[in-house]
């Protein structure tokens, strides 16, 4: 039986004394694989990987980052049937519905391809006597996203392509109920030539989520899910000084 591991620094790390939980096919009730449960230590290793990758990635020219985003879009389009099969197996939606989900996510990837070339600053001369004003946009650093069961590809594609196109590194925490398609997506990012550590993925439940919300080196968090959990994520992350967007109300 296959094991869905974390994705840290371009690999499935070899953590000791790991626990796993079952992943079921909703149509048959059959256990199809197992997923590793992440701990605070796993999150910390992912953050270290992202911090290491950040200087190289954020220092790339906008043109280079844009080309890599276009390559990622091309790979997802070519391999979308592989993603759709995994979505259907673990989520239960039809194959055509899964392809539709991927198509909506690709719209955001396409949008992200142009972002690096629009991160221009502003300059105004003589705003005061012998004073000029200059500003630019700088990436936040390490960001994180916590995504729901119902759209295991579309919602991650709402989050990390925009973040990494802006020069950030990103830690993704998908639902532990259907993580295989998301795990394959992380490998496509590496295939596109985006350096290891720019995108990391941590599996797990509340322990992994709390570690993300409380980690001192994660600057921002995005969440999509139910209203009660959105409220918890917002309050907990804000308590630790993070920028947060928590989209609640998900009910399908």
Locate predicted features.
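Generic alpha-helical secondary structure signal
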Residues: 18, 41-49, 78, 82, ...
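An amphipathic alpha-helix/helix-turn recognition signal
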Residues: 24, 41, 45, 60, ...
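Glycine-rich loop-to-alpha-helix module at the N-terminal edge of alpha/beta enzyme cores
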Residues: 30-119
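Terminal low-complexity tails and localization/encapsulation signals of metabolic enzymes
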Residues: 1-34, 67, 71, 121-147, ...
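Rossmann-like NAD(P) dinucleotide-binding subdomain of oxidoreductase/dehydrogenase enzymes
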Residues: 121-252
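Histidine- and aromatic-rich ligand-binding microenvironments
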Residues: 6-7, 22-25, 31-45, 193-197, ...
